[in-house]
Amino acid sequence: MGTLGRAIHTVGNRIRGTAQAQARVGSLLQGSHHIEKHLSRHRTLITVAPNASVIGDVQINKGSFISYASVSRDLQYPRAMGMGQVRRFSEDVSHMPEMEDSDVLNAFKDLMAADWAELPSAVVKDAKTAISKNTDDKAGQEALKNVFRAAEAVEEFGGILTSIKMEIDDSIGMSGEGVKPLPNDITDALRTAYQRYAEYLDSFEPEEVYLKKKVEMELGTKMIHLKMRCSGLGSEWGKVTVLGTSGLSGSYVEQRA
């Protein structure tokens, strides 16, 4: 085995170690899901693994579950524009929730502007502080909770997508020199990952377009990287995008100001 081969093998071993540490989130790739509505008005997608199984080197224990993400189902945000205010293009499409508390608003802005592949600890701390503080801006806190839980789900699911890609790289080589048919477990993992991705995006309500676009931009790149490494995937993979649903006009980018 040459130097490059040993390096790839070492990377594969490290990734497998990481994958084993992610066993608690491995259930995203197996089983069915149902929608459970909580008193807090959050919608949580729960994925349950009916039988113990292994996806690559990720052990999925029987009955394991994960709170995949949650978004508000009944929060209605005002869309009316006041006299003399500037109306952005596609305002009705990507309207942001109104927030009165400055701490909640700043935490919301920082979270939407952060990289969800690995959430910065400072951003997480500020978000948790704003969510738990005593304030009259309950609607703002609910909106922040939705974004924070979505960010946590995207971070964990993105880690699984990365583990799948590394497993593929370890199997066929970084440059594809050992190209061969994918093992059935990886094929099943890819199929289930796309299903979870598509179902999650479809779950967003019209008033949550800003959050849907953020999720698409965070996970779309990882999904496309998987698509580029494999041939023969279904035509549905052509729908994966990193551009969001309606471009950037009125999107979270404006919240950085």
Curated annotation (Swiss-Prot):
Annotated Pfam families: SDH5_plant
Annotated Gene Ontology cellular component terms: mitochondrial inner membrane; mitochondrion; nucleus; respiratory chain complex II (succinate dehydrogenase)
Keyword Transit peptide part of the UniProt annotation: yes
Gene Ontology terms describing biological process: tricarboxylic acid cycle
Entry membrane topology: Peripheral membrane protein
Main location class: mitochondrion
Compartment annotation: Mitochondrion inner membrane
The keyword Transit peptide appears for this protein: yes
Pathway connected to this protein: Carbohydrate metabolism; tricarboxylic acid cycle
InterPro entries tied to this protein: SDH5
Keyword annotations of the record: Membrane, Mitochondrion, Mitochondrion inner membrane, Transit peptide, Tricarboxylic acid cycle
Domain of life: Eukaryota
Transit peptide start-stop: 1-89
Entries under PANTHER family matching the protein: SUCCINATE DEHYDROGENASE SUBUNIT 5, MITOCHONDRIAL
Subunit structure: Component of complex II composed of eight subunits in plants: four classical SDH subunits SDH1, SDH2, SDH3 and SDH4 (a flavoprotein (FP), an iron-sulfur protein (IP), and a cytochrome b composed of a large and a small subunit.), as well as four subunits unknown in mitochondria from bacteria and heterotrophic eukaryotes.
Designated name of the protein: Succinate dehydrogenase subunit 5, mitochondrial
